[in-house]
């Protein structure tokens, strides 16, 4: 299993709710600070992480993302 956290910058207030609609995102919630939302992901491969982050970046209003992958 590969676990990752994707930080999302977006001026859209409901970005966390939109993230929940993305396939394979386990959880998402709004945060304060440099980013506006967090998406928690747990998948089988690194390639799936790339696919999910690409899908997130296509959401209208997403300005940038930063992905952190669990190191074991």
Task: Indicate residue ranges for each PLM-predicted region.
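A compositional/biophysical signature of low hydrophobicity enriched in polar/charged and small residues
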Residues: 1-72
């Amino acid at each position: 299993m590969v676990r990752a956290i994707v930080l999302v910058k977006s001026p859209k207030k409901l970005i966390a709710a939109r993230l929940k609609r993305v396939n394979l995102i386990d959880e998402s919630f709004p945060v304060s600070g440099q980013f506006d939302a967090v998406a928690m992901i747990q998948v089988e491969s690194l390639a799936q992480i790339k696919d999910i982050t690409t899908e997130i970046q296509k959401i209208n209003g997403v300005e940038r993302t930063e992905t952190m992958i669990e190191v074991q």
